[in-house]
Amino acid sequence: LAAAGFLIVSGLTGAVISWDHELDELLNPHLTEAVAEGPAIPSLALASMIEARDPRARVTYVPLAAEPGHSINFGISPRVDPATGRLYELGYNEVFVDPASGRELGRREWGAVWPITTETVVSFLYVLHYSLHVPELWGIELWGVWLMGIVAIVWTIDCFVGFYLTLPRRLAPAPRRRANSWWSRWKPAWQIKTGGSAYRINFDIHRAFSLWTWVLLFIVAFTAFSLNLYSEVFHPLMSRVSEVTPTPFDQRELADRHQPIEPIVSFPTVIERAVVEARARGWQEPAGDINYDQGYGIFGVGFFHPGDDHGSAGVGPPYLYYDGRDGRFL
């Protein structure tokens, strides 16, 4: 019961954010649609224009090509204010640009708690889904993520407890009585006795539906735990029972939020090296985007065609990672 409220919020928001891209385009055509005609300006040039308009901002995510008729959505991170030694408060972390004209279509704070508008409602639900918008406390931003991860662990354990409680009791030996088979005694747990009392029908619905959907419930619970507590619990546990290849992020400590790692190599240099490496691996897709994580000092270059950034079956496209200081392949 304690977990039910969390699961209701997570389930309802999860159903909505499954369509986040489609809903965002429906609600915000003024941001996502581009009307100017003509050849597209190179994305890196557009990124430089954004930084020139606001020197407090650093472009940390650059889509390298736009879908026809769509704007380009750049990810933004704040630079450090030399006067305070802390990050600037920009009030936005996304900028939408018409790729043909270079005109800025708008800015927004993805995941903002307030105000909730058509521009922010989808991202509000997205963050609510996995962190409940729990604020930063004692310099840590992950309290909400950890809380939902703990709820997922409880749910995972509850899946096994509930399954065990449906199993038939072990019968005491009775030499003169022929016992029913184990399956025949468990079979009623999978059925709903419609002729019983309201309490019995409700109990049967709860038990039967839980059994028929048990595998799905377990998968959702286990994956939620593994996503929210990946580095804290899941990866260390899996490393004990199997060989797990660490990601570049697993091998580094996260820098202090207000002391980001400044990149030394540039976007063009990293893209050039990544394209060479991708061709050596036999990848045919073009470089689709580049991002820089200033908390870890790592560049990532994804390879996909425009509009295919979710990859096959939603698992995402392949990425190559490079060190932000010396540009070496990670």
Regions found by a protein language model. Name each.
Residues 1-330:
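Conserved histidines in hydrophobic membrane contexts and catalytic metal-binding motifs
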